[in-house]
From Swiss-Prot:
InterPro entries: PsdUridine_synth_cat_dom_sf, PsdUridine_synth_N, PUA_sf, tRNA_psdUridine_synth_TruB, tRNA_sdUridine_synth_fam1_C, TruB_C. Belongs to the pseudouridine synthase TruB family. Type 1 subfamily. The lineage of its organism: Bacteria, Pseudomonadati, Pseudomonadota, Gammaproteobacteria, Pasteurellales. It holds the Pfam family TruB_N. One of its GO terms (molecular function) is tRNA pseudouridine(55) synthase activity. Keywords: Isomerase, tRNA processing. This is tRNA pseudouridine synthase B. The keyword Nucleotide-binding does not apply. It catalyses: uridine(55) in tRNA = pseudouridine(55) in tRNA. Its EC number is 5.4.99.25. The keyword Ribosomal protein does not apply.
Length: 312
């Protein structure tokens, strides 16, 4: 007798997953999606299989706002092994060069200085960036090297934690688009000994609280023991993905007009500079507005289900 098919459902919010080592971000995202029986899911910036830590999973309407988390700052704890370079710049690759390590802590501290602030970084070949529609890692696996342009990134903090030769542990607070593997590889070259990542843990995305993270095995246990309503309580509200944007609350008349897809007048346009989070008179999150020649939400949530609204 066959098992009854799961009923997929509309469920909205952000789940803070503590990603385990050894799984791809997409595979673990699909598992979370199945456990919540969600119609839609998306992650907010891939972590390498080697890496662990915070991976926000957007469900339902929250997927419309995942780009804001992709663009958010990140924090990492990383351990590098000095003296060895690998083809992937991490422990999953093949060692391609071995050099002697004879460093004092002060030499490392001095080398770190040049990696702080606004810098340029050439992405690793083992990345998901695309060239002619194909991910770079596919070229790399075929032994093909593609020329990549250096990209601007910002290292807000690069803190020395521990050096127990040949292992060096650092804490990194960085902008979007930063490859920690490349950062470690570049540091190894500056130090003259080479280096690769042996441990990588993402400790923060935007302002999400670390205490809210949950491992997949705990989520699995809850899913097996409790109804879906209990799992839903683990979800953070959709608007947390855009919590850094200023909020604009509509009055009852404006909310009513929005519901009918009508134009809405604002008494104070200064409230609408840049992007804002839009809330109804009942404090329901409606979406994000961008300032152009007129106002229209770039995305809006399930409450209204309108893709574009004109504003005056």
């Amino acid at each position: 007798m066959s098992r009854p098919r799961k009923r997929w459902r509309d469920v909205d919010g952000v789940f803070l997953l503590d990603k385990p080592q050894g799984m791809s971000s997409n595979d673990i995202m699909q598992k979370v999606k199945r456990l919540f029986q969600a119609n839609k899911a998306g992650h907010t910036g891939a972590l390498d299989p080697l890496a662990t830590g915070m991976l926000p999973i957007c469900l339902g309407e929250a997927t419309k706002f995942s780009q804001f988390l992709l663009d958010a700052d990140k924090r990492y704890l990383v351990t590098a092994k000095l003296g060895e370079r690998t083809d992937t710049s991490d422990a999953e690759g093949q060692v391609v060069e071995t050099r002697e390590v004879n460093l004092e802590t002060q030499q490392i501290l001095t080398a770190l200085e040049q990696f702080r602030g606004d810098i340029l970084q050439v992405p690793t070949m083992f990345s998901a960036l695309k060239h002619n529609g194909k991910p770079l890692y596919e070229y790399a696996r075929q032994g093909i090297t593609v020329e990549r342009e250096a990209r601007p990134i910002t290292i807000f903090e690069l803190n020395f934690i521990e050096y127990n030769a040949p292992f060096l542990t650092l804490e990194v607070h960085c902008s979007k688009g930063t490859y920690i593997r490349t950062l470690v590889d570049d540091l190894g070259e500056v130090l003259g000994c080479g280096a690769h990542v042996t441990m990588l843990r993402r400790t923060a995305v935007a302002d999400y609280p670390v205490a809210e993270m949950m491992p997949i095995n705990e989520l699995q246990l809850l899913a097996e023991s409790f109804p879906l309503s209990e799992l839903d309580r683990l979800l953070l509200p959709t608007d947390t993905a855009v919590s850094k944007l200023p909020a604009l609350h509509l009055d009852a008349e404006q909310s009513k007009a929005i519901g009918f897809g009508q134009r809405v007048k604002f008494a104070n346009e200064q409230q609408l500079s840049g992007q804002v989070r839009l809330f109804s008179a009942e404090n329901l999150f409606l979406g994000v507005l961008n300032r152009r020649e007129y106002y229209s939400p770039t995305t809006i949530n399930y409450t209204i289900r309108i893709t574009s609204l004109p504003f005056l």
